Amino acid sequence: MYKRCIGFIKLMRVHQPVGFFLLLWPTLWALWITNRGIPDFIVLSLFIVGVMCMRSAGCVINDYIDYDIDMCVQRTIRRPIVIGSVKKQEALWVFFILILIALIVVCVFNNIIAVFLSLIVLGLSIIYPYLKRYIYLPQLVLGIIFSWSILIVYTVMNCAVNKTTWLLFLANTIWVVLYDTEYAMVDRDDDKCIGIKSSALLFGKIDKIVIGILQLLTVFILYIIGIVEQLPIIFYLFSIVGASILFIWQQVLIFNRNREKCLWAFLSNSYVGMLIFVGIVLSF
């Protein structure tokens, strides 16, 4: 029974919270900006639960669809479905339960547009695992998926979708592409052998340069957000300077394209999102 529980925990990546935070941070950025400070506790709690469910659901459906691929990749060869600790049919049921909870959370807001947006991102989440078999930039679609909560926040808070909305969306999408490229650098050799496509393979020898350009773009758009929202100097100190320092550190880590260090670079992005959030919180 214990081993079964561990299998489901690993399937939903409860033991690996970085992915949860990477989805949560942009949601919190939007919540604080739309509320000009601390949002309603119930609204905040509902968004956190929704993010938890959607992140875990994404991991489950990814493992379900990528079962044949995971058997061939060093990093994923011990995943629950691959080793048999969770059956594929069971994984599908877990996915449906998580999606049901997430949809119930959205329905609590009593906003039909938010429900519609949630159904769109659900569709994208199901399609995403297949994309790496056909296109070299699935990271772009992942960026859109991970930025979608920003649109839902603005909808739920009855705020007009404005310049800041799209700047947040764009900054986060670019950020996701760069950090998932760092993640793809970990699996590059395996992906090449089994015919899986990724941005790391697309960018090839200029991967570090492209990541650097994307880092600069992310910082620049954050700077523009600060100007548009008339945020104080504390935002620039934490969000802009803090993120920039971590981006420089990531360049150091990925310099030799060492698998382990590329993974460290990816994981450090949780702190990037946190610093941006802290800067926004201290601004109100």
Curated annotation (Swiss-Prot):
Gene3D superfamilies: UbiA prenyltransferase (1.20.120.1780)
Any single Pfam family the record assigns to this protein: UbiA
Native source organism of the sequence: Blochmanniella floridana
UniProt keyword annotations, A-Z: Cell inner membrane, Cell membrane, Magnesium, Membrane, Transferase, Transmembrane, Transmembrane helix, Ubiquinone biosynthesis
Cofactor requirement: Mg(2+)
Keyword GTP-binding attributed: no
Protein name: 4-hydroxybenzoate octaprenyltransferase
Family recorded in the similarity comment: Belongs to the UbiA prenyltransferase family.
Protein EC: 2.5.1.39
Catalysed reactions listed for this entry: all-trans-octaprenyl diphosphate + 4-hydroxybenzoate = 4-hydroxy-3-(all-trans-octaprenyl)benzoate + diphosphate
Major localization listed first in the record, in broad terms: membrane
Bilayer topology: Multi-pass membrane protein
Cited InterPro entries: HB_polyprenyltransferase-like, Prenyltransferase, UbiA_prenyltransferase, UbiA_prenylTrfase_CS, UbiA_sf
Main enzyme class: transferase
Residues spanning the membrane: 14-34, 41-61, 93-113, 134-154, 166-186, 209-229, 233-253, 262-282
